[in-house]
């Protein structure tokens, strides 16, 4: 093999090595690009996932706030409705209280009412001796009906006529005005056992309060259909 052949063979080997090196370099480049694209895609997907999670979190927060605000508005509306209902019911009660002031105006009917209240109180107490308290302006009415009230009680309870002492301490007078906040009494009596352990309040105001509480569910049902 002469020098020319040797030189050609060397050049051929160099070309082969260069080609192999270029192919390897190309493979490395392609592989690196593929890995880069994969990592880039993974980063993009991770960022997308992060953005979706953040959006979902904020959307949930907005939904929760919206539900809270709706609940607060609904509760506020309910409170307003309940307050309006209470105002109407209280206005009815106040109107009834004003009507009570007219009861004692008819002396004849009021005396009969006082007698019924006294008999009812005696039947409730069932005591041989009781203390009766009334308004100062009603004292003469009480004295006029007291004897017949004691007799009626004795007949109904089948007992002797009880001793009834009219107290010198009086119930508060009728209110001086409709919007008065002072202690007042529209009429009726308060009776108690002599030792004061048993007390029966049978004033017009107390009877109205009892009747109103008893009828309140029915009143609300008729007014508000609930």
UniProtKB/Swiss-Prot annotation:
GO function terms (MF aspect): proton-transporting ATPase activity, rotational mechanism
The entry's function note states: Subunit of the peripheral V1 complex of vacuolar ATPase essential for assembly or catalytic function. V-ATPase is responsible for acidifying a variety of intracellular compartments in eukaryotic cells.
Note the subunit structure: V-ATPase is a heteromultimeric enzyme composed of a peripheral catalytic V1 complex (components A to H) attached to an integral membrane V0 proton pore complex (components: a, c, c', c'' and d).
Give the SUPFAM superfamilies listed for this entry.
V-type ATPase subunit E-like (SSF160527)
Query: Per its record, how is this protein called by name?
Result: V-type proton ATPase subunit E
Source taxonomy: Eukaryota, Viridiplantae, Streptophyta, Embryophyta, Tracheophyta
Q: Does the record's keyword annotation contain Lipid metabolism?
A: no
Asked if the keyword Transport belongs to this entry, the reply reads: yes
Q: Which UniProt keywords apply?
A: Hydrogen ion transport, Ion transport, Transport
Residues making up the signal peptide according to the UniProt record: none
Q: Which family does it belong to?
A: Belongs to the V-ATPase E subunit family.
Q: For this UniProt entry, what's an example GO CC term?
A: proton-transporting two-sector ATPase complex, catalytic domain
């Amino acid at each position: 093999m002469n020098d020319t052949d040797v030189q050609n063979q060397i050049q051929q080997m160099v070309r082969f090595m260069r080609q192999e090196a270029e192919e390897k370099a190309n493979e490395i480049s392609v592989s690196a690009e593929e890995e880069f694209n994969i990592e880039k895609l993974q980063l993009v997907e991770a960022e997308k996932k992060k953005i979706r999670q953040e959006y979902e979190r904020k959307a949930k927060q907005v939904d929760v706030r919206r539900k809270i605000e709706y609940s607060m508005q609904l509760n506020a509306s309910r409170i307003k409705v309940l307050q309006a209902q209470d105002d109407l019911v209280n206005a009815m009660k106040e109107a009834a209280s004003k009507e009570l002031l007219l009861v004692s105006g008819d002396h004849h009917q009021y005396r009969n009412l006082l007698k019924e209240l006294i008999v009812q109180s005696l039947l409730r107490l069932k005591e041989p001796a009781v203390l009766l308290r009334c308004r100062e302006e009603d004292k003469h009415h009480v004295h006029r009906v007291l004897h017949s009230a004691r007799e009626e009680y004795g007949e109904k309870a089948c007992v002797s006529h009880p001793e009834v002492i009219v107290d010198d301490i009086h119930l508060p007078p009728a209110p001086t005005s409709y919007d008065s906040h002072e202690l007042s009494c529209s009429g009726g009596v308060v009776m108690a056992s002599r030792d004061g352990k048993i007390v029966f309040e049978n004033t017009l105001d107390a009877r109205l309060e009892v009747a109103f509480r008893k009828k309140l569910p029915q009143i609300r049902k008729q007014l508000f259909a609930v």
